[in-house]
């Protein structure tokens, strides 16, 4: 517990993020005192809580390849029988019982959920369970044999206390924390948890009446090069960064873009087959905000947004191609979205905060692909100067449509298969987001398949998840919107029809040097068929491409 005060203060932070009052009792037995090494001034570290929070909300930094070398990875409760591709066990789906190992610490039987050496930072934690959350989660930092931080529940939302009265009624609820409001304990934490020389997370069950309870989790993290110095998460760090944490949370809920620069726009009525072109100012610049407005006047709204194809070209190469409905983050139907990079009102207005740099020239094109409908469209872009360097990358977005995709019953391992969500190759890049829209023909949940993401030359996926609902941070099969994940469309309670999801990545963006392969097991609670539309967003070298996309 850092110990007494820090259990409270460390855990306190999370409830202040939620705005809940404390309902759990904390108890502890005083362990042998752990004496951390004296910490130098924060400015001597390459990575601190403040640098991470600044990076999280920097649209400019998102355009650049990481300056400090790291790989992005995921630890999860996936079925540990999945070891060898091509075998039935590769698709095993008992995902609530996977963990690293069992061990005894201080006389306690603990399951190790996460264990990393060297410098790193946890960028996302997602937890849920179908049993009682009565358990204790402990964090051990920098090789400590005693826990530095203790949480009295297997539930991110139940981490409670207070950092001060001024936080109790704040809006700190759905920025750095995404609570599972409509589902028991399906919550995500995006507050970064840095560590200088290793981190171990354990779980101790407290309810003896539970027999091998399911504990689902995903932990996304960065593994830095050993040469990178990282300041470890502590009570002192939390207190010092209090104001920055508050401001970051507010910014995530109400994103701000640079209001300076030159504003250019174009509009026209688009008959079938016609296009609206917006040329951008020449020179080394960046689009820091783009807005799109569509007026249908008799044309069905969903059809109009699906028929309007947005393309963007920079320095002579097309890097964006997606219907406006998919580019907005909503998918078919173009429902409302409120996320970090994108906002849509569900009525024809779309605001993009993706920064799009270029060295010489750029243009947007909206083409009306309808054979019968006429619409009025307007495009505007705010263009600013941009400092191009050897880390700078171009913005890319691509979309594909897959018909009659086979959904396998979740426990039919022998017939399991991986459907390719996206393969991006041709140079450096950072995966920044995706939209997954599945038009389901069954009357059951179609998203039990795990994501598997392979980076460059990995012989095993560095990201191996526990299901579509967990990847998109909702777990409850309900409509919701948040900065980094959401489900803007859910046609029916039995999941028949469209189920649309988005995920956007800041600190958990996945860098790659040559190639990124994203597979998804197609498994559900009922065998059947579905049509799928998916879109990927990434920053990459100009020549990078998503295989098989528009």
Model-flagged regions — what are they?
Residues 1-8:
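Bacterial N-terminal signal peptides that target proteins for export
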Residues 9-19:
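Bacterial N-terminal signal peptides
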Residues 20-39:
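Bacterial Sec-dependent N-terminal signal peptides
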Residues 34-550:
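Beta-strand-centric surfaces of beta-sandwich/beta-rich domains
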């Amino acid at each position: 517990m850092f110990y007494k005060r820090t259990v409270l203060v460390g855990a306190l932070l999370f409830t202040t993020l939620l705005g809940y009052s404390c309902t759990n009792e904390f108890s502890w037995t005083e362990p042998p005192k752990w004496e951390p090494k004296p910490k130098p001034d924060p400015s001597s570290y390459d990575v601190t809580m403040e640098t991470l929070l600044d990076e999280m909300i920097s649209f400019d930094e998102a355009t650049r390849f990481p300056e400090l070398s790291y790989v992005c990875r995921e630890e999860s409760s996936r079925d540990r029988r999945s070891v060898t591709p091509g075998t039935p066990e590769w698709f095993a789906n008992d995902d609530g019982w996977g963990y690293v190992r069992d061990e005894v610490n201080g006389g306690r039987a603990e399951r190790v959920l996460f264990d990393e050496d060297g410098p790193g930072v946890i960028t996302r934690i997602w937890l849920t369970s179908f049993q009682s959350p009565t358990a204790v989660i402990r964090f051990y930092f920098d090789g400590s044999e005693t826990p530095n931080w203790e949480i009295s529940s297997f539930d991110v939302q139940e981490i409670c206390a207070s950092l001060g009265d001024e936080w109790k009624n704040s809006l700190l609820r759905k920025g750095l924390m995404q609570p599972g409001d409509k589902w028991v304990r399906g919550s995500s934490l995006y507050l970064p948890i840095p560590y200088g020389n290793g981190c171990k997370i354990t779980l101790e069950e407290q309810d003896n009446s539970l027999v091998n309870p399911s504990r689902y989790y995903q932990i996304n993290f960065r593994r830095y090069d050993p040469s990178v110095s990282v300041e470890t998460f502590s009570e002192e760090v939390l207190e010092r960064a209090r104001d920055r944490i508050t401001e970051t949370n507010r910014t995530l809920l109400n994103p701000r873009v640079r209001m300076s620069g030159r504003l250019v726009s174009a509009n026209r009525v688009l008959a079938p087959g016609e296009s609206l072109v917006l040329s951008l100012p020449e020179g080394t610049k960046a689009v820091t905000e783009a807005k799109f407005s569509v007026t249908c006047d008799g044309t069905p709204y969903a059809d109009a947004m699906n028929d309007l194809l947005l393309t963007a070209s920079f320095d002579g190469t097309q890097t964006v191609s997606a219907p406006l409905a998919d580019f907005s983050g909503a998918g078919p139907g173009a429902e409302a979205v409120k996320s970090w990079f994108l906002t849509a009102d569900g009525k024809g207005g779309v605001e993009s905060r993706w920064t799009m740099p270029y060295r010489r020239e750029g243009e947007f094109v909206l083409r009306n692909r309808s054979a019968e409908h006429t619409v009025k469209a307007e495009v505007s872009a705010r263009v600013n100067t941009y400092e191009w360097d050897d880390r700078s990358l171009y913005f890319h977005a691509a979309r594909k449509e897959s018909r009659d995709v086979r959904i396998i019953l979740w426990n039919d391992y022998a017939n399991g298969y991986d459907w390719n969500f996206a393969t991006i190759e041709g140079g450096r890049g950072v995966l920044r987001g995706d939209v997954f829209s599945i038009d389901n023909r069954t009357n059951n949940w179609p998203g039990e398949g795990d994501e598997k993401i392979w980076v460059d030359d990995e012989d095993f996926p560095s990201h191996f998840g526990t299901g579509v609902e967990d990847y998109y941070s909702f777990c409850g099969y309900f409509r919701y919107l948040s900065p980094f994940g959401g489900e803007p469309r859910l046609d029916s309670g039995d999941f028949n029809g469209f189920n649309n999801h988005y995920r956007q990545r800041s600190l958990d963006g996945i860098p790659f040097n040559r190639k990124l392969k994203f597979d998804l097991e197609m498994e559900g609670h009922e065998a059947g068929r579905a049509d799928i539309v998916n879109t990927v967003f990434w920053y990459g070298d100009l020549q990078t491409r998503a295989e098989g996309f528009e």
